[in-house]
Amino acid sequence: MRPEHWLDMVRCIRENYDRYDGFVITHGTDTMAYTAAALSYLIQGSPKPIILTGAQKPIGFDSTDSKINMTDAFRCAASDLPGVSIVFNNHVILGTRARKTRTKSFQAFSSINYPDLGILRDGVLLRYIRQDCTTVPTFSDTLDNKVALLKLTPGQDRSAADFFLERNDALIIESFGVGGLPEHGGFYDCLQSWIEQGKFVVLTTQVPSEGSDVGVYHVGHSLKAVSYTHLTLPTIL
C-alpha cells in the first residue's frame, strides 16, 4: 500500500459518489489504519459511509473472520453512518482513531483515546456515538509524501533528526512519555533551527493511550513544534 493508492481510492469514490449510498473497501490489516486515516482527510464531510474491512484469517479457512467482517461492513455501508470507519470483529471504529493492536487475534484493531462509534450485535448496528452529517463532501487529490518518522531512544543525538529533515518536508517525532525530548547533543537547537527554516516538526508520544502534553517539560514547551495530543500515528502522518 502506497499513498498513490489512497488517491486512486479517492478518485474511484468521487467518480461513483452519486451512484451509491455507501462504499466498502476490502484491505489488508497491516496498513488498514493508515488508509482509514488518509481517506478521512482526503474525503471530508461525507454523509455517506465509507467502510474499510478485512480479515485476520484468509477466506478459504474454516475459521476465517472474513465472512462476518464483510457482512458487518455492508450492513454499516447501508446505514446512515457518515464518514470513514473501520468495521472489524463487530466493532465500528472512527477512521482517525484506529490502530492495529493485535497481530493474530480477531480483534485486530482498537480505538485509541476515543470510544468505538458502535458495535454490531445479531446483525444490528448499535451506535454509541451518533455523528450526523448533512454537508457536501470535499475531495482532495494531493499528498506530500516527504514525511519521516523518528522514534526517540535514550542517548539519541541530533544526527538522525538532521538526516531526516534534510530530505523531507516534515518530521514526526515519537517522544518519551507525555512529550519528553533529549536535553543533550544539540537536539533542541537542531529542531528549532529546522523549524525556523520552514520545516514542519510534529511531536507525539510512543505511549498508545492518554496522549501527550509537551508543555509538561521545558524543552518541549519552548519548542515551536506542533503537538497532536491524542491522535494515532497513522492519523498524524
Language-model regions, residue ranges each:
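Internal gly/pro-rich beta-alpha loop/helix module
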Residues: L52-R121
